[in-house]
Structure formats: structure tokens, C-alpha cells
Amino acid sequence: MTLNDFHVSEPYTLGIELEMQVINPPGYDLSQDSSTLIDAVKPQLTAGEIKHDITESMLEMATGVCRDIDQAAAQLSAMQHVILQAASEHHLGICGGGTHPFQKWQRQEVCDNERYQRTLENFGYLIQQATVFGQHVHVGCANGDDAIYLLHGLSHFVPHFIALSAASPYMQGSDTRFACARLNIFSAFPDNGPMPWVSNWQEFAGLFRRLSYTTMIDSIKDLHWDIRPSPAFGTVEVRVMDTPLTLDHAINMAGLIQATAHWLLTERPFKPQEQDYLLYKFNRFQACRYGLEGVLTDAYTGDRRRLADDTLRLLDNVTPSARKLGADSAIDALRLQVKKGGNEAQYMREFIADGGSLIGLVQKHCEIWAGQ
């Protein structure tokens, strides 16, 4: 399979994708009716796109190319309104969160889509288990070499992005003890985690060619790396965040990634090296397991530091870039979140500790997404 040339796009432009849960009240399990909902809302869209994801209990909201987080917020808000109206008419609910807390993967129906059916053939039950819900953020790049540099730079902050967005403590009716259990679902996939090391776009093209020899990779979309280049869009796509419970938090996470990309490409604070990834999976695990209370270990010095403290340092570093991009409100909101010491996974556990049920938790998530 030949790799597309890297499409030239305007640096730092944004695209946001949100994988949403389609809920069936009053039991608040996942519905299998996303196709009905998607067909109802598509004719009403004026910007962005609403489409299928892997299974019939999922739908994806995707913006077009946006200059800044305000434009992205406007597009997502308009889609949110249309979806909620259609969901109400069809007696369905919509919510965020990285996992549904008590759905059974065996009940999930893979969409009648050629690509997803081929993926089901390749990966079997793993695809049904991948009924989990993430936020993806695309950032525009001028060329392929910049994209590879940006990918390596952003990889330093994968634990930070995970910890800030963690919203998946419950799965299959149980507390997993993880802040973000969603990413564990992909651990059995052969392309889980970081992209194999390359130093420029030419080397990446060679890597992709070799991956295509496996017959399991037909396009970039078939690769499940934490961060991947998207040559057709001219972007780098960050894929490690849980879908937030609110649109505001989704916008804040996108603003952080946009500002971090600007800081990385203008300041060039790192010289990427393969050794940067030696402890990548250990630090990623700390973020998934403990959220902001996790501990990062430096691959070169062995120094250890709290993820919360290092996240505050990242927010300080990218603040000037955020101001230039109009994303400073996002950085301010995330800084406040870190100082308060929580994420949405912690809120979910507090809800249950206060006597709530998992059914009640999903109902509450639907109310939060609807702004009630």
C-alpha cells in the first residue's frame, strides 16, 4: 500500500473528533441504534460531520478544519444541539466518558461498514471490546518532517494528556482501580502504544511500506498508535484522551494540544532521540493507573516527579503560545483543575462513594452532556 504524500496544511489549525456513547434509557445500557440517530441528524448539519464508529452504540462528532478553539467550540456545540434533539425524539441519551461502566462487549454489534467488517475479520472479539470512547485532536503541519518532529515532541506529554482527561474508571460493572482503563483495551493490538522510531518523513514512508507487508494495514487509519501522522489531512493526531463528560473540557484539551504544538515547533525544546521512549510505557501506565497522582521517571537521569507538578510546568511553558492562538482560557481552566487535584474519573468514584449506582452514574453523565 502506497503512502499518501503529506498534504500541506496551515500550521496549528485544529480538528477535533469525539466518540460519544449512545444510551438506552431507562436501563442506561448502551443502545444499538446509532445508525438511526446518525441518519436523522446528517441532513441538519451545517458544519462538521457526524458518523459511525466501530459499533452501533457509538457515534463520532468531527469538526472541520478550525482556526482556533472558539471556532471548534461553535461547530461542536451546533452538532451537540442537533444530536441531543434527535436523541430526545428517538428516546435515546448521549454522554461522554471513556468507557460505559457496565456494558457487556459480547452484545456489541459492529457497524455494517466495509472497513470495520474487515477489521473484525482481522482482530475478532478485540474489535467488540474496543467499544470505548476517546477524543482525538488533529493539529496542522506544514510538511512531513515537521509532523515527525511534532509527534516525537508531543510524545513527551502523553502521560499529561491521559491524566488530565482520564474518565474511565469503571468497566464491565467493576471499579478497575485505573483512572483511565480505556487504553488498556488496546494492549492486545500489535500496534498499541508509540509509533516505531523514525527520524523524518522519508523514514516514515519506509516504515509504512513495511507495515503494509503484513496485509493488516491498508491505510493510516488502520494504525492504533497513541499519536500518528495523518498525511491526507496534513496533521498530527493525538489519540490518548478519554472523551470528556463536557464539551468545555474537550475544548480545553484541544487548546492544550494546539498550544503545545505551537511551543514545540517554534521553540524546538527537544532533540528527538530513540532513547526518549525507553520508559514511555512505564510513564504512560502511571498516568492511566493513577492520573495526576502518577509519578514520571526521566529516562536519562532517573529523576522522579509527580505528574501533577510536571503538568503545571507544561502549562506554564505553553502559556505564551496559548495567548497567541487564543487558547489561554483553556490553559487557565486546566491549571485550575490540576491545582484542585482531580479529574473526571475521581468525580465518578465520588458519585459511587456517595451512594450512587452505575446506572445512576450513566444517567448523570447524560444529564451533564445535555447541560442539565
Swiss-Prot record:
This is Putative glutamate--cysteine ligase 2. The keyword ATP-binding applies. InterPro entries: GCL_type2/YbdK_subfam, GCS2, Gln_synth/guanido_kin_cat_dom, YbdK. Pfam families: GCS2. Transmembrane segments: none annotated. It is an enzyme of class 6 (ligase). The keyword ATP-binding applies. It comes from the Bacteria. Keywords: ATP-binding, Ligase, Nucleotide-binding. It catalyses: L-cysteine + L-glutamate + ATP = gamma-L-glutamyl-L-cysteine + ADP + phosphate + H(+). Gene3D superfamilies: 3.30.590.20. One of its GO terms (biological process) is modified amino acid biosynthetic process. Belongs to the glutamate--cysteine ligase type 2 family. YbdK subfamily. NCBIfam families: gshA_cyan_rel, PRK13516.1.
